[in-house]
Amino acid sequence: EANVWYLERLHLGKHRIDESKSLISISFMEVKEIQNREILQAYMKYELGITGQAVSTIVRRFVCIRNFIELLGQEKILAIHATVAEVKKYADGLRERGIQAKGFNERIFGIGHFYKFMEVKQYITRMPFRIEYFQQKEVIVHHDRSVEETVYMEILKKLYLFPERLRCMFLHLWCLGLRASEVCTLKGNAYYQQGEDYWIQVYQVKMKNYKRIPIPQALYQIMKVYLKK
């Protein structure tokens, strides 16, 4: 079994891949113990082949699991022999690092998901710990990421100094309120005219669907000129 999996060779559906992210491969080389590595590879075959989740979600969970297995390896412990004590030690390490509740829970749930897989596949007879025992209470915080008017007006004044590609990207962010990741994955055929209205079609990775957004005529004309070059 290869210890590095290249995503382009896995023939995954395009709707599962966020093209704005630079993820190229998945590495198992960090897991030195052979049995631990083989079980982790079996788990990733299930995740990538069966679940249909976004690759970025799967890989984020994979990294948490791999980090935990690496810690087990340092103690010469097989993943199938891990107990609640090892999970507690891992959780204590997260707290010492100041990991917030959301990130903490994501890591613990990821490890729990891995052990539930092992239970179903009969690598182990039962889960060695209860996720609920470690789960932290999450306090939802609203992050105001809006840009002050003085800032974006200053950018607009100096926009002519930027390369054309960056000018176009900024206009999409400013005019349409798109996410940066959405702007980075726009295709040339995303722009079209319908009657007297102008539209852009944007793919949403999380929703696994396209959304249509009305755009100013000026932006449509700018992009038509840019795309002809």
List the model feature ranges, each with a label.
Residues 61, 107, 165-166, 215:
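Hydrophobic (often cysteine-bearing) scaffold residues that line and stabilize catalytic clefts
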Residues 119-128, 192, 228-229:
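Proline-centered turn/helix-capping motifs that create local helix->coil transitions or kinks
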Residues 34, 81-82, 145-146, 159-162, ...:
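Short helix-capping and inter-helix turn/linker motifs at the boundaries of alpha-helical repeat units
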Residues 185-225:
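Conserved tyrosine-mediated DNA breakage-rejoining catalytic core shared by Y-recombinases
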Residues 1-24, 50-122:
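Non-catalytic DNA-binding core/recognition domains of DNA-processing enzymes
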Residues 153-180:
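Basic, Lys/Arg- and aromatic-enriched nucleic-acid-binding interface segment
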Residues 22-26, 89, 97, 124-155, ...:
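Flexible interdomain linker/hinge and immediately adjacent N-terminus
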Residues 111, 169-170, 181-186:
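Alpha-helix N-cap/helix-start motif at helix boundaries, enriched for small hydrophobics
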